[in-house]
Amino acid sequence: MSDEFNANQFLKTVTSSPGVYRMYDAKDAVIYVGKAKDLKKRLSSYFRKNLANVKTQALVSHIANIDVTVTHSETDALILENDYIKQYMPKYNVLLRDDKSYPYILLSNHQHPRLAYHRGPKRDKGQYFGPYPNGGAVRESLHLMQKIFPIRQCDDLYYKSRSRPCLQYQIGRCSAPCVDLVSEEDYQEQVRLATLFLKGKNQQVMSVLVQKMEQASSDMRYEQAALYRDQITALRRVSEQQEVSNASGDMDVIGAYYASGVACFHLLFIREGKIFGSRSYYPKVPVNTEVSEVLRSFMLQFYLNSDSQRLTPKEILISDAFEEQAELADAIQSAQNKKVEIKTQVRGERASFLRLALTNATNAVNTRLSHKNTIEQRFLLLEEAIESTNKIQRMECFDISHTMGESTVASCVVFNREGPSKADYRRYNITGITPGDDYAAMKQAITRRFDKITEKGKIPDILFIDGGIGQLRIAQKVVDEQFVALDNAPTLIGVAKGEGRKPGLETLIYGESEESFSLPADSGALHLIQHIRDESHRFAITGHRNKRQKTRNTSTLETIAGVGPKRRKALLQYLGGLQEVKGASVSELAKVPGISLEMAQTIHDALRG
């Protein structure tokens, strides 16, 4: 506790009402946010002589000031506490790192509705189904539905531009409403069945399809009956793969496990009795935090995140009880205007779901701990191999990627003692150099990385360069220039490919002395170097391919006078890609919003050249 903070004097001013408190350190940064039913009683507990909790002792030792906000009720205090935690991200709070909104399937409100992936604010009119645990689950579901229901998934601009059916129609995954190859009645019937399917009512869909197949067969419409038969077969195959409970309804099932400083909350999303998917969360947990506080903090931030598109079900099952369960349920009801039950003691199928979630959480933590131990061991071996007197906390690796000098991209990936730190990854688009000049590309990337670097900046202990002595010399020269006024420059090591480019035969080169050395193929230190090198290569080539594709899609259009970014985007979206634009007639080009007949002729002539 700061010498300037007088706890006794402060506590005399605190009320016994419910509210929220913010603790500040000497730098005026919020280090902890908490809530209390009785502020005076709760805050007094921090300043007792014998504090058993090590984490609380550390927290109190840094307190320089405390702000208190009184609320009308404990429920209001819970909601405000969550808002403050999100705002300040305090050091001593358990922090849920989940800033992504959840994806949904959108069934649009169009004359011929489309099924689409959606993430973010629900601005488009239509029905939203979800949330799904991740984007992959949505795409998998959409791919699955294409095989069962011939409903379009193209965007509206593409739909409007069609004068003939696309490939999806040819392979039986769309009924081509864009060119009137399906009746309005039949299309809407498929939309209705898809809606029931997304609501989990598979048996109802099956009954309708069987009835329609039998009716079509009776009417001797055998081709139509065969189509219904194929739908039934596909639907039955899907239903067999899904674990369905007719009694469970909508639930979130949370398995919580915490060991050796690593916490995992594994969520099963149960919607309409069906497992929609699952997702694991790894909150940032301060050392020596009690399990009950970890669980409470996770639930608070997860369900009171006002920015999320998440829909909370009426029932939440958790593997462990925690304090203030009832208060949290009240806070959710207040925030979302929906009654929620939080349960731990359940039987039958619910208990089975809970065991499954807990098993997944336990396995996830054990896997992370194993990975963490492996990474830590490899760091120790690397320190030994290069005879480092200091502990390596941060490593970076640079790589260059291009195709014959086109669309050059440099990557910088970062590893710490827990493995890849993807939030710190960076890509650099390289410009103004001779195409294919890897030395100039490396110089530009390293210069941009360390431009205006300071003592307090994120400086790596080791900087790996994926390349030979030439690129290493360039990088070393830039680092020497940038760190001339600093005494904490990184150690540079080049990673040159071995004979036949075989893994395990790499030659390692120190940047300063240019002394080369190698490590045994089975060395854990070498495996760590290979890991960061391969990750740097992957990150560079992914960025290069994306840039190259974007360039090739637009470069042809960029040379046409009068076709700026907006018109290029409209042409590509409306017609469905560069090849479609090249193959379009003048009249088809003129249908694109913002393209006059005269401009269409100009574009047509330029592309046909």
From Swiss-Prot:
- The answer, when asked if Ligase is one of the entry's keywords, is no
Keywords from UniProt, A to Z, are: Cytoplasm, DNA damage, DNA excision, DNA repair, Excision nuclease, SOS response
Coarse class of the primary localization is cytoplasm
A GO CC term? Answer: excinuclease repair complex
Where in or outside the cell it occurs: the entry states: Cytoplasm
Q: Which Gene3D superfamilies match?
A: 5' to 3' exonuclease, C-terminal subdomain, GIY-YIG endonuclease, UVR domain, UvrC, RNAse H endonuclease domain
Q: Where is the GIY-YIG domain?
A: 16-94
Domain UVR residues, every copy:
203-238
GO MF, one example: DNA binding
One BP term from GO: nucleotide-excision repair
Q: Which InterPro entries match?
A: GIY-YIG_endonuc, GIY-YIG_endonuc_sf, GIY-YIG_UvrC_Cho, Hlx-hairpin-Hlx_DNA-bd_motif, RuvA_2-like, UVR_dom, UVR_dom_sf, UvrABC_protein_C
Q: Which domain of life is it from?
A: Bacteria
- A matching Pfam family: UVR
Q: Which family does it belong to?
A: Belongs to the UvrC family.
Q: Which purpose does this protein serve, as stated in its record? A: The UvrABC repair system catalyzes the recognition and processing of DNA lesions. UvrC both incises the 5' and 3' sides of the lesion. The N-terminal half is responsible for the 3' incision and the C-terminal half is responsible for the 5' incision.
Q: How does it assemble?
A: Interacts with UvrB in an incision complex.
Designated name of the protein: UvrABC system protein C
Origin species, per record, is: Shewanella pealeana (strain ATCC 700345 / ANG-SQ1)
